[in-house]
Swiss-Prot record:
This is Thermosome subunit. Molecular chaperone; binds unfolded polypeptides in vitro, and has a weak ATPase activity. GO terms for molecular function: ATP binding; ATP hydrolysis activity; ATP-dependent protein folding chaperone; unfolded protein binding. Forms an oligomeric complex of eight-membered rings. InterPro entries: Chaperone_TCP-1 (IPR017998), Chaperonin_TCP-1_CS (IPR002194), Cpn60/GroEL/TCP-1 (IPR002423), GroEL-like_apical_dom_sf (IPR027409), GROEL-like_equatorial_sf (IPR027413), TCP-1-like_intermed_sf (IPR027410), TCP-1_chaperonin (IPR053374), thermosome_alpha (IPR054827).
Length: 542
């Protein structure tokens, strides 16, 4: 029998424990702080963030996922919310800020319900019901978009690019993105592999200089200046083997006593390299991309044959070259045949921003393309590349799913209206959670108004009134005019998948945090490289 009053120590002294409401409040606070961090970046008039790392490197962006990735975050609940943004980026390529802001608002509404003594399980059930209903309603709100509807696809890309630092050239960028995505669509499945669109970044020119190359651009130069700079009607060999004499695996030693033998040895080495080059030339190849090294002597012989050669090409670039030119990657020079060669109308070395780059262009049916992103400075071109990447993601979603919804907060207001109506049919305290979910969705139009310097209350009232009318589900906030307008007419549209993924991710993250009622945190080991006092996760750290 245990002694009365004697304390039983289960956890070590350096472990902190937060139980029940304390744990929930702490997690909710951490999640809300992450959401507040990116909230001001939402929409076309959202502000940018400047992030400076330990080395003094600067990133200027308003891309939600980039901000969250670059931030050093300690709190485990905050890290879970950052995962929401990463999932959104990976799945659909855009809507990261929307997902995180909705998650933060769901947590804020959940805290209000917890203060009314509503059990977390009830809130979770209500949120799950609301999420399922929202996704169902989204499908009924969505409009169809056909793959051949270029104008609509351009509008989708422009909506994504707006507010991302590349606005002045958004029409041109949208056109480039739509062309690029269309070029790599799999004709059988209708799917798009984003990896087949290479975004090459070079500063030193205005954003308007951004171009689509129907082929591949390699950030390399010719291995020998004697080689031709430009090859028309190129026959391209892709080699995954070095053009040099292979060293043996064994540590063999050759003792030469006669100087003539040494000359024979060197001549034999030369002959082996010359034979390799002869074999390549015999196939009719006049351009060689090699994943490994090219011997100095091999470079000389290739130049004499008028063959343009590039070495140490990345594996990903080799795969894109194969897709663009129709070439096959060969792992042994002896196996190279004319059938393995790819074709391109032009292969040329050009100077871009002072650096030599190899352009492989005029491919007949390229299944890999390159967007050469330009900007006046390194920070501008990085932001342009991020905008292009997001636009590729949304156009890909629209082509694959074929459904779009109105932007500018129109969809969120409509969902909130329908969820409030649905809440009336829900019995029990879950009804309050469904209503809270509906209110949380309105954070998107409210934030769009705030970030544009408009009165959020006035705008919400106008939006709700517009949505009560027949066909009002497409009315959203035009932040440039400060008016409530038809978003489809205005061309502010987003793929359905971006919205469903944002609502799914936000709900799952908030539900996961609400389920936690006990946090047991070990203190960091002293002398840890990030500082020894980081174990405390109390509210004072945030």
């Amino acid at each position: 029998m245990a002694m009365a009053g004697a304390p039983i120590v289960v956890l070590p002294q350096n472990v902190k424990r937060y139980v029940g409401r304390d744990a929930q409040r702490m997690n909710i606070l951490a999640g809300r702080i992450i959401a507040e961090t990116v909230r001001t970046t939402l929409g076309p008039k959202g502000m940018d963030k400047m992030l400076v790392d330990e080395l003094g490197d600067i990133v200027v962006t308003n891309d939600g996922v980039t901000i969250l990735k670059e931030m050093s975050v300690e709190h485990p609940a905050a890290k879970m919310l950052i995962e929401v943004a990463k999932t959104q980026e990976k799945e659909v390529g855009d809507g990261t800020t929307t997902a995180v802001v909705i998650a933060g608002e769901l947590l804020r509404k959940a805290e209000e319900l917890l203060d009314q003594n509503i059990h977390p399980s009830v809130i979770i059930n209500g949120y799950e019901m609301a999420r399922n209903k929202a996704v169902e309603e989204l499908k009924s709100i969505a409009k169809e978009v056909k793959p051949e509807d270029t104008e609509m696809l351009k509008k989708i890309a422009m909506t994504s690019i707006t507010g991302k630092g590349a606005e002045k050239a958004r029409e041109q960028l949208a056109e480039i993105v739509v062309e690029a995505v269309r070029a790599v669509v799999d004709e059988e499945t209708g799917k798009v592999d984003k990896d087949l669109i290479k975004v090459e970044k070079k500063e030193g020119a205005p954003i308007e200089e951004t171009k689509l190359i129907r082929g591949v651009v390699i950030d390399k130069e010719r291995v020998n200046p004697q080689m031709p700079k430009k090859v028309e009607n190129a026959k391209i060999a892709l080699l995954n083997c070095p053009i040099e004499v292979k060293e043996t695996e064994t540590d063999a030693e050759i003792r030469i006593t006669d100087p003539a033998k040494l000359m024979e040895f060197i001549e034999q080495e030369e002959k082996m390299i010359k034979d390799m080059v002869e074999k390549i030339a015999a196939t009719g190849a006049n351009v060689v991309f090699c994943q490994k090294g090219i011997d100095d002597l091999a470079q000389h012989y290739l130049a004499k044959k008028g063959i343009l050669a590039v070495r140490r090409v990345k594996k990903s670039d080799m795969e894109k070259l194969a897709k663009a030119t129709g070439a096959r990657i060969v792992t042994k020079i002896d196996d190279l045949t004319p059938e393995d060669l790819g074709e391109a109308g032009l292969v040329e070395e050009r100077k871009v921003a002072g650096d030599a780059m190899i352009f492989v262009e005029q491919c007949k049916h390229p299944k890999a393309v390159t967007i050469l992103a330009r900007g006046s400075t390194e920070h501008v071109v990085e932001e342009v590349a991020r905008a292009i990447d997001d636009a590729i993601g949304v156009v890909k979603c629209a082509l694959e799913e074929g459904k779009i919804v109105a932007g500018g907060g129109a969809t969120e207001i409509e969902l909130a209206k329908r969820l409030r109506k649905f809440a009336e049919s829900v019995a029990g305290r879950e009804q309050l959670a469904v209503k809270a979910f509906a209110d949380a969705l309105e954070v998107i139009p409210r934030t769009l108004a705030e970030n544009s310097g408009l009165d959020p209350i006035d705008m919400l009232v106008k939006l709700r009134a517009a949505h009560e009318k027949e066909g009002g589900e497409v009315y959203g906030l035009d932040v440039f005019e400060g008016e409530v307008v038809d978003m489809l007419e205005k061309g502010v549209v987003e793929p359905l998948k971006v919205k469903t993924q944002a609502i799914d991710s936000a709900t799952e993250a908030s539900v996961m945090l609400l389920r936690i009622d006990d946090v047991i945190a070990a203190e960091k080991v002293k002398g840890d490289e990030k500082g020894g006092e980081g174990g405390d996760m109390g509210g004072d750290e945030f």
